[in-house]
């Protein structure tokens, strides 16, 4: 199967912008919220964004299956080698509460690795996208800029990003191996993007969430030069039958100061 990754990613950019604006419009009108079987909230914003993104992806790649958080049957095992992962709104709680760090996510996985990744951050008017090694970008206010996470850094200024202000002991132990000086709390897959652009240096997490939560941000960060593995230094791969993520370690570079 011949896939033009660049063309597909670029054709999805206006769709992500449309879906992002729709998420804002629906929030402003007042969201309709339900509770899913797993106890997590879902809004009409999640569902509408899913519809907009999925429709365009089906047009672009009709033969490639889509696995979306909002439509997947978790009991069905994933046996695909090429597939899309969509998390229409990662950070639904942030979205519902009016915060600005929720994200729109889509990734194309090929042979266990995310190649294309798009992460929209509507309230910040940012869109991160990538389609190949060395080809990660941020679009802001209509302008596209290539991003690269490599930079010179003071050894005493290693900054971690986390979904918690106080990560658990296992994670702190790993962060201390890299002489982390401070931890900033950020929600959703936006964390991946802020490593991709060099804002933060490292992110570590225990086993959590599902593949659609990570894949798009993974592509953006890895294609910007980040090193992404499990906590025990194994490759971080996709296409697991149950969609569950292992532990995660993202580093801006091998030693974080050059």
Predicted features and spans:
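N-terminal subdomain of lithium-sensitive/metallo-dependent phosphomonoesterases centered on the IMPase/IPPase/PAP
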Residues: 1-89, 173-177
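Residue-level signal for inorganic ion chemistry
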Residues: 23, 46, 57, 92, ...
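Short gly/ser/thr-rich secondary-structure transition/capping motifs
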Residues: 66-70, 143, 232-234
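Conserved PLP phosphate-binding loop immediately N-terminal to the Schiff-base lysine helix
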Residues: 71-77, 94, 194, 232
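DPxDG-like acidic metal-binding loop motif
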Residues: 78-137
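Short hydrophobic/aromatic-rich beta-strand segments that constitute the beta-sheet cores
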Residues: 117, 136-140, 162, 202
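An extended, acidic
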Residues: 149-258
């Amino acid at each position: 199967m011949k896939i033009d990754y660049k063309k597909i990613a670029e054709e999805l950019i206006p769709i992500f912008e449309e879906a992002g604006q729709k998420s804002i419009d629906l929030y402003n009108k007042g969201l309709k919220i339900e509770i899913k079987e797993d106890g997590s909230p879902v809004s009409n914003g999640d569902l509408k964004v899913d519809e907009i993104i999925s429709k365009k992806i089906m047009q672009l790649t009709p033969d490639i299956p889509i696995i979306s958080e909002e439509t997947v049957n978790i009991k069905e095992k994933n046996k695909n080698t090429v597939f899309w992962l969509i998390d229409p709104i990662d950070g639904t709680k942030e979205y519902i509460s009016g915060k600005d760090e929720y994200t729109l996510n889509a990734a194309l996985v090929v042979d266990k690795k995310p190649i294309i990744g798009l992460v929209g951050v509507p309230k910040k008017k940012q869109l991160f996208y990538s389609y190949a090694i060395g080809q990660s970008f941020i679009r802001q206010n209509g302008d596209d800029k290539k991003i690269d996470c490599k930079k010179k850094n003071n050894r005493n200024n290693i900054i971690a990003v986390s979904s918690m202000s106080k990560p658990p002991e296992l994670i702190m132990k790993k962060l201390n191996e890299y002489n982390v000086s401070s931890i900033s709390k950020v929600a959703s897959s936006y964390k991946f993007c802020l490593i991709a652009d060099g804002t933060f240096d490292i992110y570590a997490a225990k086993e959590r969430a599902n593949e659609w939560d990570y894949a798009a941000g993974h592509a953006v960060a890895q294609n910007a030069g980040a090193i992404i593995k499990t906590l025990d230094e194994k490759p971080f791969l996709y296409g697991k039958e149950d969609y569950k993520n292992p532990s995660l370690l993202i580093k801006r570079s091998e030693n974080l100061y050059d």
